[in-house]
Regions:
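C-terminal, surface-exposed recognition/capping segments
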Residues: 61, 334, 343-344, 361-435
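Extracytoplasmic/secreted proteins, especially bacterial periplasmic and envelope-associated proteins
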Residues: 151, 155, 159, 336, ...
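Surface-exposed ligand/attachment interfaces on beta-rich extracellular proteins
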Residues: 11-45, 147, 346
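Extended, beta-strand-rich, solvent-exposed assembly scaffolds of outer structural proteins
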Residues: 50, 113-204
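Beta-strand-rich, repetitive solenoid scaffolds
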Residues: 27, 36-37, 52-54, 61-64, ...
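Structured segments of extracytoplasmic/periplasmic soluble domains
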Residues: 159-167, 344-347, 367-370
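Short, solvent-exposed loop/turn segments that connect beta-strands within catalytic domains
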Residues: 134-136, 347-353, 401-403
Length: 435
């Protein structure tokens, strides 16, 4: 490890730091010692550290944040995830961007009132094809004559394919939709393969509910508001109010008493005090500060999502081996990421069967904590697995909703949101025991 001396902090800041070895720097004027680490392996991982498997499938923990130099990670190492909590010898790891990124691979719709009398009947089903968007439900109406479930399923498949072609869907999209006979339950199952819509994953990925069970407006997760940088780690109502004076929303319609989708930014103090559209807020909250606290700092449990699961491991055991048929006549795992994690466990020596599983309430709550995000964000950004900016003037440790955190850009004064813990990128949770 190199040891260097600088006359001042300005000289140190101006110097080019090494990218392949660690360095200890002494600032002569202040006698400050600064350690610049590069890919430092540790046996005592903490939140934000990056987890790899070496070429022998051994777990390697590397110090996160500014210590990571992705370009110089050994090519034989596989990036597994990030440490998001540590309790004694137990280490929690988020698995990011692994061999299979999806929680859920199929969406199914049951047609239960199939008539098998050989006469002609008409049936209409509503499906979300993602055309023109995932909020659009398309009616598929067709006639069928069937004496068996298989005949009804074939007619349904033909109707779906024809409707998709009419809508201009690609051949790949058409191939994802089909229907098959569920003889045991005397019904037809309409199936969509390769489910990747973010809203579908966001809810179904953790609870396995179907589109029909999803709320029209899913509940948002709110956390502490305020700006965090490496220079000013202040998170409080006063800062929020100061920013919202000019940066808050000016409502153009009546404000609900709790934030809804699209209303992630609080109204301005002036609007709260005098706008006709804030009458509900003034009647509910005595002060603007109370409005901020109740709407933007208190975290309410979600009706859906990972907070509905008391035990992620129990859910994993229930769902890991569930299969679904394929249009080509084979079978596949319905929850491929869960199967991969729970059944294969990455082949790590000492990692028992089933150590990887879906987050439950405890794991999910930890993932939503702002202090966890503060530690994870620099490492995630350094590894380039999600779009989080962690420069000193741009990171903001506030929950916007279940997937997003705010980014405050100190250069232009604007707020942005980016995925941090994302149901497409974040798969199962691992609980590992260190020696």
């Amino acid at each position: 490890m190199a040891i260097k001396s600088y006359n001042s902090k300005a000289d140190y800041n101006a110097a080019v730091k090494p990218t392949t070895e660690s360095q200890v720097s002494m600032i002569e004027t202040t006698r400050e010692v600064i350690v610049d680490g590069v890919n430092v392996v540790t046996t005592q991982p903490t939140v934000g550290d990056v987890v790899f498997l070496d070429d022998q499938n051994k777990v390697i923990y590397v110090k996160g944040g500014s210590w990571i130099q992705k370009a110089n990670i050994p090519v034989a190492w596989t990036h597994v995830g990030y440490v998001y909590f540590r309790k004694g010898k137990q280490v929690g790891v988020i698995h990011k961007d692994g061999a299979d990124r999806k929680y859920l691979d199929v969406s199914q719709f049951a047609w239960t009132d199939v008539v098998l009398d050989g006469a002609e009947h008409e049936k209409t089903i509503g499906l979300r094809f993602g055309i023109p968007n995932w909020d659009t439900t398309t009616s598929v109406t067709f006639t069928y004559t069937a004496t068996t479930i298989a005949e009804a399923a074939a007619a349904c498949t033909a109707a779906i394919e024809a409707k998709l072609a009419e809508l201009g869907a690609s051949a790949a999209t058409i191939a994802e939709w089909w229907a098959y006979a569920d003889e045991d339950n005397n019904r037809v199952i309409v199936q969509r393969d390769n489910c990747t819509d973010w809203r579908f994953n966001g809810c179904s990925g953790l609870t396995h509910i179907t589109w029909g069970d999803m709320p029209e407006n899913s509940y948002y997760w709110r956390g502490e508001r305020g700006y965090y940088t490496q220079y000013r780690g202040v998170m409080n109502i006063a800062r929020t109010k100061a920013w919202a004076t000019n940066g808050g929303r000016i409502p153009t319609s009546q404000e609900p008493i709790k934030p809804i989708a699209g209303n992630g930014v609080p109204v301005r103090p002036s609007a709260f005090d005098s706008s006709e559209f804030c009458a509900n807020l003034r009647a509910t909250y005595a002060t603007y500060e109370e409005y901020l606290e109740k709407c933007y700092m208190v975290a309410y449990p979600q009706k859906y999502g990972c907070f509905a699961l008391p035990s992620g491991k129990a859910m994993a055991e229930k769902y890991a081996r569930m299969t679904a048929p394929t249009k080509a006549g084979g079978t596949k795992y319905k929850y491929p990421a869960l199967y991969y994690g729970y059944n294969k466990s990455f082949g790590v020596d000492g990692l028992d069967f089933g150590d990887w599983y879906l987050p439950g309430v405890a794991e999910g709550t930890m993932l939503m904590k702002d202090e966890t995000l503060v530690a994870l964000a620099p490492s995630i950004s350094k590894m380039g697995t999600t779009a989080v900016n962690n420069s000193t003037d741009r990171w903001c440790a506030e929950r916007y909703n279940v997937d997003n955190a705010w980014i405050f850009n100190g250069n232009d004064g604007n707020l942005y949101t980016y995925y941090v813990v994302n149901s497409v990128r974040c798969q199962a949770v691992a609980l590992l025991n260190i020696d």
